[in-house]
Amino acid sequence: MIFTRLTRFVGHGTGLRLYATAEKSSLATLRKKTGYTFANCKKALEMHNNDLAKAEQWLQEQAQAMGWSKATKLEGRNTTQGLIGIMVKNNIGAMVEVNCETDFVARNQSFQKFVQAASTACVRYMDQIEGDANLTKVGLNSESLKQIKLEDGKSLADHLALMIGTVGENASLNRAICFKAPESINLTGYVHPAPTEEVPLDVPQFGKYGSILAFKHTSADSNGEVAKKVCQHVVGMKPAKIGDKTRDEPAKDKDDETCLIYQEYLADPSYTVAEVLEANNVEVVDFQRFECGEKIKMDDETVRAVN
């Protein structure tokens, strides 16, 4: 009889330990997956009988509601800092500006991940737009950007509110420019500061400055290296337009030059950009430059409504 009681006691204790271990494992998994606090993850699991899927859904719903509440309270506070995000995938390129209040938040991982998500969402949006034989260029203002959907079906506005709730600071989707190129035209992009390690352009990158260049080239620049350097030049030298030799005259003072083709080439000032392009059989079709915090509104004529 004593043996029977002892067996029952040991068996019951083992069961408790196994349950406690499973509970800790679920808690660790949920914490790692969502990034939410230990207390909130524990509460979610307790409310849903240790069901991970239901607990995660509840946490996301709570975070979304808190994010919208936080975003509403912080709305109107100046957002002069932030990042420029760029992604170029095959024949589609997107550049987006996301702003926040401080440079501290701009370095926050949650904010940076949102910038990457916004860049990816713009590429997906542009992929759904029918292109033609010419370069298609679409500008998106703040309201249009907010409507764009991510893969999870939620809008960028929803994800923005969620991010605001996480970082505790106001943030805003400012603008984006998207390109869709036919086979005859190539795209490249550049952000500054550039990543410390080389990253493929189809992986979203971010920095304080960015540019996208649409170009045509021949075998002389088969890997697009010259075009990449010109894209970097656009960030550094801030040209206002490509320029046309039949209509535009070089500026009297080289420091005042705003035509890309007449500017001294950033990588080698002994040449002009036009000379470098001609020597390598590269033709610039279009370009766009963003600087974080610059006071430039998206031209309404380029804005296309998001369906």
Curated annotation (Swiss-Prot):
Residues 1-19 form a transit peptide. One of its GO terms (molecular function) is translation elongation factor activity. Keywords: Elongation factor, Mitochondrion, Protein biosynthesis, Transit peptide. Associates with the EF-Tu.GDP complex and induces the exchange of GDP to GTP. It remains bound to the aminoacyl-tRNA.EF-Tu.GTP complex up to the GTP hydrolysis stage on the ribosome. It is found in: Mitochondrion. Belongs to the EF-Ts family. GO terms for cellular component: mitochondrion. InterPro entries: EF-Ts_dimer_sf (IPR036402), Transl_elong_EFTs/EF1B (IPR001816), Transl_elong_EFTs/EF1B_dimer (IPR014039), Transl_elong_Ts_CS (IPR018101), UBA-like_sf (IPR009060). The keyword DNA damage does not apply. GO terms for biological process: mitochondrial translational elongation. This is Elongation factor Ts, mitochondrial. It comes from the Eukaryota. Disulfide bonds: none annotated. Its main location: mitochondrion.
